[in-house]
């Protein structure tokens, strides 16, 4: 997409709560900057089982930022609510549960169309994963079976939130996150961004900047992973091999 025509405005957050801080505290300034003068936010709570409690928590937190939040699970016409909202917030939790709901409620296309038209998108954890082409880099248990692994395709790369570096002193013999990402790359072409805790990707059209105290770890098929900070815009220029599916 030509950057002059690219209206995407995304904030992709590794984790909604940082150790020692409250819900979305570390992301508040970035959220405020992203939404600007907009006031109404539509919330997608389907990554958690208790949608009422999740919505109440998000409503209270965003109200403290001067924002009015409503949830898609409280309205009769979800697509209409997405169409009318000033911003979209997809919360974290179980990615399989979230993706199943996105497909079953027909939310993939309405969300994608609005975001590509310039409506701000906030995604935390699972909500960040689904901004990519598929859910294939989630670490979550497959507690439900979605009809497809395809997600929103707002960015052409995969996201692996809560990225943990291998601990050389650990006696645990299970797979590391890096090993699992390498398994993904054995079968898939899309680049993967490992987002450490406290990290956020801020997409403004054709520009993407890493925010937060930690570098991201970038994985590409056939290449050694590397650390990256600051401007990560080149990742937006890559082509995904899997598009979104309604």
How would you label these PLM feature ranges?
Residues 30, 104-118:
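Catalytic-core regions built around general acid/base machinery
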Residues 2-37, 49-56, 136-137, 141-246:
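C-terminal and late-domain segments of enzyme folds
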Residues 95-96, 128-131, 200-202:
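Short, active-site-adjacent cap segments at secondary-structure transitions
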Residues 16, 93-96, 127, 164:
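Short glycine-rich anion-binding loops that position phosphate/pyrophosphate groups of nucleotides
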Residues 40-43, 47-98, 103:
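Portal/gating segments that form or line small-molecule/metal binding sites
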Residues 89-92, 115-134:
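Catalytic nucleophile loop
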Residues 83-84, 117, 154:
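Alpha-helix C-terminal capping/helix-to-coil transition sites in glycosyltransferase folds
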């Amino acid at each position: 997409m030509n950057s002059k025509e690219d209206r995407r405005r995304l904030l992709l957050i590794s984790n909604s709560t940082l150790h020692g801080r409250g819900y979305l505290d570390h992301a508040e300034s970035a959220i405020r900057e992203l939404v600007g003068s907009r006031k109404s936010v539509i919330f997608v709570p389907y990554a958690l089982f208790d949608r009422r409690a999740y919505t109440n928590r998000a409503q209270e937190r965003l109200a403290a930022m001067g924002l009015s939040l409503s949830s898609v699970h409280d309205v009769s016409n979800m697509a209409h609510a997405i169409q009318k909202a000033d911003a979209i917030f997809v919360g974290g939790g179980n990615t399989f549960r979230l993706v199943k709901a996105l497909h079953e409620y027909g939310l993939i296309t309405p969300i994608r169309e609005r975001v590509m038209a310039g409506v701000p998108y906030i995604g935390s954890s699972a909500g960040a994963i689904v901004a990519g082409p598929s859910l294939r880099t989630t670490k979550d248990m497959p507690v439900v079976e979605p009809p497809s692994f395809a997600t929103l395709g707002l960015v052409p790369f995969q996201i692996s939130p809560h990225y943990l570096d291998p601990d050389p002193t650990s006696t645990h013999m299970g797979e590391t996150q890096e090993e699992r990402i390498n398994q993904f790359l054995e079968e898939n072409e899309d680049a993967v961004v490992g987002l450490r805790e406290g990290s956020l990707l801020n997409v403004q059209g054709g520009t993407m900047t890493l925010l937060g105290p930690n570098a991201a770890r970038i994985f590409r098929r056939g290449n050694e992973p590397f650390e990256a900070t600051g401007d990560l815009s080149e990742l937006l220029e890559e082509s995904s091999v899997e598009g979104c599916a309604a």
